[in-house]
């Protein structure tokens, strides 16, 4: 299996992408196409002693889309941008999936332009795996759609359920609707309008969940609009780092606490690994006709490796076919709602 990697994407340049790809080739038994400036990539591969690594190849793409650039405009004008070429490799059938830690908006636009949407999907969504005390939970949308309607959230719920079944191995995932209270009548207009539709959708809908419920894994899937979802995602990432920083500061104040911390070091390391965004590696773009992974801009070698691993797992699982099937089953419901807008 070949996976295309936007080697120019991310805040730290080529090296973490190359090292993560090399590790994936060695450990996952897959092939990775590094997409970026051919001259720079070959120089970096040589300096890292990876020029002859079987399964690692280079595809020339001289242009880069900056993090602060207009996604739609840049994707249309820069045909040779690394993220565009990576998506095109999937369209051509030369790769089964693509991964990018670059401009997330550009990644979504490139995926839509080159791979297209699954028929019947109104809007693709970013599904972010988040750590909880019970394991991973999927939050969507995590930033693709700032403004949403009930029919969009309904589709997010369906796609999120399929993802957690296929990737997390949960037979009947619990789905929650993010709100400001557990009661059905709580929330803004979007939440209130969406609630009855989710209740009658045939999924395992468990009602409203509050922000405080997310870290405890009350449900396996949490559905919300992209603006709220992205705020939740960034808050959880920042909170985990802040907690470790505060604990470290308090431990240093007390010699006895320092001794206890030494004994608890393995436990701290384990929790840190679980809460580290690099462990998930990336978030799938659900609803496009193929596998596309959106990674964090600050992705390390480990994050890149895990993003490639997620891409491979999704291809192997056949989850895109399952989404097509389920969206088709709900097509009449979605079309009626869309006609009312």
UniProtKB/Swiss-Prot annotation:
Pathway: Lipid metabolism; phospholipid metabolism. One of its GO terms (biological process) is fatty acid biosynthetic process. Its EC number is 2.3.1.274. Keywords: Cytoplasm, Lipid biosynthesis, Lipid metabolism, Phospholipid biosynthesis, Phospholipid metabolism, Transferase. GO terms for molecular function: phosphate:acyl-[acyl carrier protein] acyltransferase activity. GO terms for cellular component: cytoplasm. PANTHER family: FATTY ACID/PHOSPHOLIPID SYNTHESIS PROTEIN PLSX (PTHR30100), PHOSPHATE ACYLTRANSFERASE (PTHR30100:SF1). This is Phosphate acyltransferase.
């Amino acid at each position: 299996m070949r996976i295309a990697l936007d080697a120019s994407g991310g805040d730290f340049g080529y090296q973490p992408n190359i090292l993560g790809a090399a590790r994936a080739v060695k450990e996952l038994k897959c092939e990775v196409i590094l997409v970026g400036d051919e001259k720079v990539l070959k120089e970096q591969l040589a300096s890292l002693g990876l020029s002859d690594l079987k399964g690692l190849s280079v595809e020339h793409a001289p242009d880069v889309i900056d993090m602060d650039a207009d996604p739609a405009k840049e994707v249309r004008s820069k045909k040779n941008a690394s993220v565009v070429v990576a998506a095109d490799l999937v369209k051509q059938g030369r790769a089964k999936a693509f991964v990018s830690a670059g401009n997330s908006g550009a990644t979504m636009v490139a995926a839509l332009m080159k791979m297209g949407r699954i028929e019947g999907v109104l809007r693709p969504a970013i599904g972010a795996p988040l750590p909880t005390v019970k394991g991973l939970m999927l939050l969507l949308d995590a930033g693709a759609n700032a403004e949403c309607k009930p029919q969009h959230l309904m589709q997010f719920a369906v796609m999120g359920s399929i993802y957690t079944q296929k990737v997390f191995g949960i037979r009947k995932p619990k789905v929650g609707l993010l709100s400001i209270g557990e009661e059905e009548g709580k929330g803004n207009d979007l939440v209130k309008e969406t609630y009855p539709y989710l209740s009658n959708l045939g999924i395992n809908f468990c009602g409203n969940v509050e922000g405080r419920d997310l870290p405890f894994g009350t449900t396996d899937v949490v559905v919300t609009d992209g603006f709220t979802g992205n705020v939740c995602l960034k808050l959880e990432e920042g909170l985990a780092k802040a907690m470790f920083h505060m604990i470290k500061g308090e431990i240093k104040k007390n010699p006895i606490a320092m001794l206890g911390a030494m004994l608890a070091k393995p436990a701290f390391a384990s929790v840190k690994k679980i809460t580290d965004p690099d462990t998930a590696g990336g978030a799938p773009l659900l609803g496009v006709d193929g596998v596309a992974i959106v990674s964090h801009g600050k992705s390390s070698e480990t994050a890149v490796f895990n993003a490639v691993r997620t891409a491979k797992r999704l291809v192997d699982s056949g989850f895109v076919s399952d989404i097509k099937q389920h969206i088709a089953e709900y097509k009449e419901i979605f079309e009626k709602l869309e006609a009312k807008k």
